[in-house]
Amino acid sequence: MDIVFEKVEHVYNARSPLARRALYDVNVAIRSGAYVAVVGHTGSGKSTLLQHLNGLLQPTSGAVKIGEETITSHKRPKQLKPLRKKVGVVFQFPEHQLFEETVEKDICFGPLNFGVPEDEAKRKARELIKLVGLSEDVLAKSPFDLSGGQMRRVAIAGVLALEPEVLVLDEPTAGLDPRGRKEMMEMFYRLHREKQLTTVLVTHSMEDAARYADEIIVMHEGTVWGHGTPEEMFRDADKLAAIGLSVPETVKLKQQLEKRFGVVIPSPCLTLEQTAEAIQQLFSKVSVHD
């Protein structure tokens, strides 16, 4: 499902003394099936941009086109209901979205709300609980008796239960330890491929953006500063530093090695695996002297 922002502006508390412009002149397209990371310094407009993707916020001016749906300032909330089925949002702490007596009821809530028969909703719950890495035994339990990591997976299953075509992730690994973070990101990447989703990841982690995204959108002061592949966006560390961002540690190492040995390393070095291979090739060609 293609996503297009056309001259989007968003002003909080418009037409009041407290008016604050959060987005202006945002023009960007996300192709169907892409995995796109949105990065930017705190206050850059990332989260405001995200909330336009399923109509939680509507543009003050301009339009957001998501598939055949168009969101403008004139849309009524009821008109956005079909869109919210197509666009699933996983917030920073998705476990805070849990509220039902059992895990099964929580996962079934969304589908039942959209008219899915109860037996079909329960079948989906059984399928999804396994998809997010939990056993069916969990379905009968209270979500509040689970560990934090398990609760997060249950909440994600609830989002997936509506079978969204677009999955929006707002810092979904916040508060997790490194191992939990990696497991969660790998799960999202697997879901992206298996379900053929359009995935939009809002993140502060340049490493996650480099490793998983096909494209990166860089936000700065409420507008799109840059948009391209990870290799393109991380090519100029100084420009990113000027807007308060850094490149991944692997890219820093690559640039230091190029400067030290006066060579060009063809690999983008976006992941540890790419970097290890590039270093091995470099030292097989370069003689190192004290």
From Swiss-Prot:
UniProt EC number: 7.-.-.-
Subcellular location: Cell membrane
Gene name per UniProt: ecfA2
PROSITE patterns membership: ABC_TRANSPORTER_1, ABC_TRANSPORTER_2, CBIO
Known function: ATP-binding (A) component of a common energy-coupling factor (ECF) ABC-transporter complex. Unlike classic ABC transporters this ECF transporter provides the energy necessary to transport a number of different substrates.
Residues the record lists as binding ATP: G40, H41, T42, G43, S44, G45, K46, S47
Predominant cellular place of this UniProt entry's protein: membrane
PANTHER family per the UniProt record, alphabetical: ENERGY-COUPLING FACTOR TRANSPORTER ATP-BINDING PROTEIN ECFA2, HEAVY METAL TRANSPORTER
Similarity comment: family membership: Belongs to the ABC transporter superfamily. Energy-coupling factor EcfA family.
NCBIfam families: ECF_ATPase_2, PRK13634.1
Gene Ontology terms: cellular component: ATP-binding cassette (ABC) transporter complex
Molecular function as annotated in GO: ATP binding; ATP hydrolysis activity; ATPase-coupled transmembrane transporter activity
Membrane topology: Peripheral membrane protein
Domain of life: Bacteria
Domain ABC transporter: 6-246
Name used for this protein in its record: Energy-coupling factor transporter ATP-binding protein EcfA2
InterPro entries: AAA+_ATPase, ABC_transporter-like_ATP-bd, ABC_transporter-like_CS, ABC_transpr_CbiO/EcfA_su, ECF_ABC_transporter_ATP-bd, EcfA2, P-loop_NTPase
Enzyme class per UniProt: translocase
Database matches in SUPFAM superfamilies: P-loop containing nucleoside triphosphate hydrolases
Organism: Geobacillus kaustophilus (strain HTA426)
Subunit structure: Forms a stable energy-coupling factor (ECF) transporter complex composed of 2 membrane-embedded substrate-binding proteins (S component), 2 ATP-binding proteins (A component) and 2 transmembrane proteins (T component).
Keyword tags: ATP-binding, Cell membrane, Membrane, Nucleotide-binding, Translocase, Transport
